[in-house]
Amino acid sequence: MGYSYSEKKRIRKDFGKRPQVLNVPYLLTIQLDSFDKFIQKDPEGQQGLEAAFRSVFPIVSNNGYTELQYVDYRLEEPEFDVRECQIRGSTYAAGLRVKLRLVSYDKESSSRAVKDIKENEVYMGEIPLMTDNGTFVINGTERVIVSQLHRSPGVFFDSDKGKTHSSGKVLYNARIIPYRGSWLDFEFDPKDNLFARIDRRRKLPATIILRALGYTTEEILNLFFDKITFEISGDKLLMTLVPERLRGETASFDIEANGKVYVERGRRITARHIKALEKDNISQVVVPSEYILGKVASKDYVDLESGEIICPANGEISLETLAKLAQAGYTTIETLFTNDLDYGPYISETLRVDPTYDKTSALYEIYRMMRPGEPPTPESSEALFNNLFFSAERYDLSTVGRMKFNRSLAFPEGEGAGILSNEDIIAVMRKLIDIRNGRGEVDDIDHLGNRRIRSVGEMAENQFRIGLVRVERAVKERLSLGDLDAITPQDLINPKPISAAVKEFFGSSQLSQFMDQNNPLSEVTHKRRISALGPGGLTRERAGFEVRDVHNTHYGRLCPIETPEGPNIGLINSLSAFARTNDYGFLETPYRKVVDGQVTEEIEYLSAIDEANYIIAQANSNLDENNRFTDAFVTARGERGESGLYKPEDIHYMDVSTQQVVSVAAALIPFLEHDDANRALMGANMQRQAVPTLRADKPLVGTGMEKPIALDSGVAVVAKRGGTVQYVDASRIVIKVNEDETIAGEAGIDIYNLIKYTRSNQNTCINQIPCVNLGDPINRGEVLADGPSTDLGELALGQNIRVAFMPWNGYNFEDSMLVSERVVQQDRFTTIHIQELSCVARDTKLGSEEITADIPNVGESALSKLDESGIVYVGAEVKGGDILVGKVTPKGETQLTPEEKLLRAIFGEKASDVKDSSLRVPNGTSGTVIDVQVFTRDGVEKDKRALEIEEMQLREAKKDLTEELEILEAGLFARVRNLLISSGADAAQLDKLDRTKWLEQTIADEEKQNQLEQLAEQYEELRKEFEHKLEVKRKKIIKGDDLAPGVLKVVKVYLAVKRQIQPGDKMAGRHGNKGVISKINPVEDMPYDENGQPVEIVLNPLGVPSRMNIGQILETHLGLAAKGIGDQINTMLKQKQEVEKLRSYIQKAYDLLGNGSQKVDLSTFTDEEVLRLAGNLRKGLPVATPVFDGADEAEIKELLKLGGLPTSGQITLYDGRTGEKFERPVTVGYMYMLKLNHLVDDKMHARSTGSYSLVTQQPLGGKAQFGGQRFGEMEVWALEAYGAAYTLQEMLTVKSDDVNGRTKMYKNIVSGNQHMDPGTPESFNVIMKEIRSLGLNIELDEE
């Protein structure tokens, strides 16, 4: 495979040994596919909006004479595009129009004759739409709906593991979980009776459920027990023998037949005895009559003459009943077969505690349990029970639930409905009893075959259905009110409940989260996050250790590394790199199929359920050139995910990639295999907090995962079609599309507008920079412009920094870092932060607020940065406390004296009835105003500034559209010119004519004439579309804004701050090696090497051994080698050596070991391409060391040698202050360092006086509340230990909550008197009141 033009600019050397069989799939599939299914019409009506409509409609009136039917739906085009919605603070959504049909039937007619049909389209609220990047814009902010991992519907068998009862007895239970509807549980109690619960309410004997289904005692016993038949023959009692049932019992009598004793009394019956009995075909044995005593009758035995029941079903047989049965003429007696070992008498025992006796009494019992306090009637109790599990409206197992149910109970696949049947309930009870009897095992609820993913589409559909059901109730009421002649479907439907349900879900659900937009990786990870929390999921407090732990089914599905630290650990996971969900919502991972020990190219996705039956080899198994395993035994995962050694011919599948275990964030960590898991977790999490730097710098040591993440995140601009760059500037790129990719009759021009300096959710800066030049050939899918944190289409979260591992005067104690001043001077970690501040003018009771520059009691200097409308200029440098938007609010009328009233009447209104409520820059913030936006309510007059902004927007829109039109016209006329010249026209003559005249020419060739006419039509179309677009844009700009009720105007001011790195900022590497900057050191004081090159950061070597993240050391070595090669290339370029020398050196670097995936052949490159490549490699040769398949020690040494560096990776350094040599070589190299979004500027905070808590009167805490620092009990102990009594008294009284004391203190300080007069702290009064509230009077004696 060759490289394209832009790929040749910079090629990453790959150390991977194994070929890439499968590319990393598109990373946002889980979001986009799910939402597509929700919105796109499904002809079968199995999913999405269609399914929701079909499940609720038709709505039939109570009398059955009218019904409202659903026909179909359509989504309108959204009014504003994504960008406009973000600016305006509105939701990016499309209106939903549903075609409904109201059918009324003739009441008089005997057959259902249609009397009237009305059909019209009804508006049903708005559905938020997903942007191309898998996010939603809700009220102007980007949000992500996180997928949820919840328990799959179906049936689960579990046990309490002996924790419930003090005896430690294991109690088994079964639970049928539907997708929606009531849960049904069966459970054993310590006495081995079987109970049922509905919706986790009070338990009832399980046989009540069976009776409610209509079964009699005899039928219930028949369902669950085998029978033993006894025959009465004279005074003898014969038992029908099934030898297998006797295994393990002790014979209580001699088992003999035909005069031969098979088992003597008191002996244990073994398999040998059973064999002998079977061999001689013994079917009956004589038993003593005591043997039947205590056995349980399997049916009612009735005296046929008197009708009296001698022995009821489930009654015990005694000597008395035996005699009566013989007397009544019964020759055979059937009893239940039970034993203590593996056929327990559970159902029989349960029937004894069951208070009910027939179906009605059972239904009454269930009714009383579900609705205590209501008197049951036969109809209501029957209806309640049927609605619980047998009504499709109230109960649905769903296709997933039915599939899991059938698999668990070994029913045929694909059979059964969404509701339960009698057979289903009996099968569950049977399996539970089998498990109690020791046959079968309980399920593992943490197995990923029992947990499924619920994504956006499915959750949105459920919310939509909830809204529809609310509407259904209202419609039913309206339909039953009569007078349907005048009513149309439009009148019946109120869209409010639907839009409220949808809005609530997208706006405030626990799973609808504010998008983490620090950098492209954090966006991608957030969209691939899988949470076990949320509605219908777990809660943090209740989740135990097992749920949070890594399970062997996570392999290739959920990342074992990336999860938050803290209370959510293990509950929030990340999707593995190659994982996807299947139609049922279970996670699948890809494997290569293995046939007879040969690995094929065929790839199959397996879910955790399917995987259980296969043996799967690891991705790093050794293969020969025919893809056969070379080892006699291969490490593979077999039953239950346990790994072992297997023969090649026993293996069914093989892993696709070494990276398939981990998530994309963990796959970005080079040498992950050498890091401790805890540190790797921190590394994966901290990459998401990296702030995009001013100039992105690709990592020298990467993993090859950088490209897919940058492309899929959507922050970079990617070419939709191939072509040539025709125009490029900072804000737009124009591509002339290749002829073979254009559609007939279009201009063949693609225009990409770039995003410039906008604010992200985390206040970081989003800006796109073109990375192509005029005339560059472009292929489809290539990067045209880099976004934040991307460099030539590769993810670049930080900077490559020269580091040394050595102590330096205690400045790197406890993970601190010593940073060189050069890093600050070169702006390596300078970041731009954009803050949005808004000012709202409302209509108050006392009058409306006004935005104006005329503010009472404010000096001229404070207004110097405002224009005449009272709004700050763009470009103004502002600092804390400056006014950004002047605003005055009407004050309440104060009572005026008659004299004042007279003055008022004479001089007119004074400005004293308004107070200043201007928007000011918050304290501690400073920056430059980069943009101002004014939104004015419809019908409110726009101020001068708003009109100026409007005019500017109109100008820009017109300029943009005109430029676009010119580019498209140029493309069209070029085609016209070519057409005319090819038909024999003279080029010089044509150029003299006006271009529009070209279209009026005639050509003899009819086909060409048609083409010309087509182009003329296109030209007209272009002009028309231009006019139309301009008009639409003009209307949008001029139109008033849709603001919240009571709001007249909103002014948004954007401030940009450039933040350089400084002591107190938090930095980190990719291996969980985080630290705080302790000092910025002058360059001349930093340690330097023999060439006089100083290091940029000094790290503490003691941070490595105990943390066990050795990956950082290997990264440092490999980084040094990569930079060494870059330096060599740079020297050759400076010396202007011939291209061949350059080519062979670079070729040598690429050929050095590794490169399992793709060989780089520079002989196919032109000299110009080699030079351009060399130019991009000056700063270092970028290398990729894939996770679990990376560079080893020998390879790093080879690369160091090629770069002309010592293979130890250690260099002699000299002290920058004294010039002395350090006594031993130091590990120096290049590490990729990130600046995290924990900046000291955002954390620094100080308070003198401020707000106090209402009850305790103590200062509030935290920067947001402008709070104080808590002087806690340990600090109090410290002062006590020092005996600093007065200081302690001051801390606990006047500095805290002694209200009078602190007022006095304030006065004293003002008057220059340093005296303290402490009183009683307010919190003491609080505790006194609390004690009084307990009914104990407590008083302070003043003496």
UniProtKB/Swiss-Prot annotation:
- Reaction(s) this enzyme catalyzes, per UniProt: RNA(n) + a ribonucleoside 5'-triphosphate = RNA(n+1) + diphosphate
What GO MF annotations does this protein's record show?
Answer: DNA binding; DNA-directed RNA polymerase activity; ribonucleoside binding
Q: Which GO terms describe its cellular component?
A: DNA-directed RNA polymerase complex
Top-level lineage group: Bacteria
> What InterPro entries does its record include?
DNA-dir_RNA_pol_bsu_external_1, DNA-dir_RNA_pol_su2, DNA-dir_RNAP_su2_dom, DNA-dir_RNAP_su2_hyb_sf, RNA_pol_bsu_bac, RNA_pol_bsu_CS, RNA_pol_bsu_protrusion, RNA_pol_Rpb2_2
Alphabetically sorted, this entry's keywords are:
DNA-directed RNA polymerase, Nucleotidyltransferase, Transcription, Transferase
Instruction: Provide the GO biological process annotations.
Output: DNA-templated transcription
Q: What EC number is given for this enzyme?
A: 2.7.7.6
PROSITE patterns found in the cross-reference section: RNA_POL_BETA
The UniProt function text for this chain reads: DNA-dependent RNA polymerase catalyzes the transcription of DNA into RNA using the four ribonucleoside triphosphates as substrates.
Assembly mode: The RNAP catalytic core consists of 2 alpha, 1 beta, 1 beta' and 1 omega subunit. When a sigma factor is associated with the core the holoenzyme is formed, which can initiate transcription.
Q: Which family does it belong to?
A: Belongs to the RNA polymerase beta chain family.
Recorded protein name is DNA-directed RNA polymerase subunit beta
What organism is the protein native to? Haemophilus influenzae (strain PittEE)
Q: What is the lineage of its organism?
A: Bacteria, Pseudomonadati, Pseudomonadota, Gammaproteobacteria, Pasteurellales
* Gene that produces this protein: rpoB
